[in-house]
Amino acid sequence: MRLKKTSQTTDLVLALFLYIPVVWAALLIAQSLGGGLPELLSNLTAALEQPFRIQWTDKSLLSILVCTGAYLMGLCLYASGQGRTRDGEEHGSAAWGSPRQLNAQFRQKQNKILTRHVRLGLDTHKHRRSLNVLVIGGSGAAKTRGYVKPNILEANSNYVITDPKMEVLTATGGYLKRQGYDIRVLNLVDLSQSDGYNPFRYLRDEKDALKLVNTLIQATTPKGSHESDPFWSKSETALLQAIILMLFQEAPEYEQNFSMVLRVLEYAEVKEDDDEYVSPLDLLFRAMEYENPESVALRQYKVFKQAAGKTAKSILVSAAVRLAPFNLPQIKAVTDHDDMDLYTLGERKCALYAVIPDNDTTFTFLVSLLYSQIFQTLYYCADQIHHGALPCHVHFILDEAPSVNLPGLPRELATMRSRNISCSTIIQNMAQIKELYKDSWETIPGNSDTLLYLGGNEASTHKYISEALGKSTIDTKTHGQTKGRSGSYSTNFQMSGRELLTPDEVRMLDNRYCILFIRGTRPVMDEKYELMEHPAIRYTMDGGGPPYIHRGTVEPPITGEPLFQIDFDNEKENAAA
């Protein structure tokens, strides 16, 4: 709209300027009407030599009115023709932009590195773009080397990093430590080098406990699985909510963990042929009922107890299988205490690495729980403590994002900008997010104002990039020849539309180059960033520095009174009496 107003103002000024020679010509015509064309030509020659020696006659006003009418008619004809044409853009106006001009528009003192010549400033109020970036690149397309590592070495944000294979941690952890960052690691590749992460530490009220169970169910459900009857998962959800809420409300802090949830499940005995059987867990909830009959935990447990004996046993088995990883001593050692201190992620310099294996997804549900609670905690701090944006910018770098089940990612991408949070979603191709997010997959590129394509070999991605580049108008030349006695030869010139890059040309993109889209600007093709050119490269393992080895923390000593002090034998006798 602003461009349209500017164009209209320019046209009006030009029309007024051109009206001056129209009036001059009208006065010249008026003083020559009596002598006809010969006198007009004579006066024209004299007027060109002395343009300001024109006399006013009794016919000057009429001449000005006639010439003005003709001038206005000509303007109307010109305007009507302009409204229906866009010369040179009949079939599309797509064109390549300049990397250096784009960089001049968006570069600031603190930036994200996008390509060799383009930076994106972290101050969103200046360029009015979100900092969310969708990075697409197949294996070997330099996603880690050309984007992940350079942006970590900028050390201008707090970071939450998904690190397949532990490559990024060993390469960049030492440099961030040198820059004063507090390094926290959830290491699922080598659990002995992991800090503790206990999801119970971030439960502030009953709503958080319910969210935790829902996230756990979603994260431990295999991708692509479809339940014919949701009864089982809902019943299992009610049972786990009851146990987790009970521990949250009644247990000492050292018993608030998932290994304790498994222990509580062991007390939930069910006998298929005896619906009146009272299990130790039943006794525990009866004791709770005396103290707090309106407890949400108690209500959820009563939902579970509505199931018959055989059905209840199946629900218990399903819940125990879902939580089986917490039986492992290594997982128990990590999840029984907490070192992540998620409340400070937006407060002071820190970097959190989630190291996941690239060939096994057994324990990646822990990363799903972690990320879900990070978003909840950061949103809480921004909204309730800082009443707006976090003091420190938090940059999520989700390398191989589809390998971690993040069902809330499309929603969070749409809401994180105002809280000083951004996300770099890194995928191999568009088919991955289409499979993972089904009908909502377009929300991810839609809420990422920057798209960086590094190359790949997947057909739907080639088509997507080609369509995003758009069509341009080109000149075409065709030749025709007719042979025979009256043969002829003809050449025709015309305009037609053509994609800026066709899908097969996108596939053939030189591995040294990438394609960059920033909302509201023309796409650019530029060289990928070269990691070895970064000023801090000498402090990393890639530049000859030592690898970073993270040392996990020791579980703190147990303090407080245990929850299970009930004499179950006496309670059973009292119940029978």
Predicted regions and their residues:
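Basic- and hydrophobic-enriched, low-structure N-terminal and domain-boundary segments
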Residues: 1-141, 145-148, 471, 482, ...
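Conserved ATP-driven motor cores of ASCE-family P-loop NTPases powering translocation/secretion/packaging/pilus
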Residues: 413-415, 419-515
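Intrinsically disordered, low-complexity segments enriched in small/polar residues
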Residues: 32-34, 119, 272, 478, ...
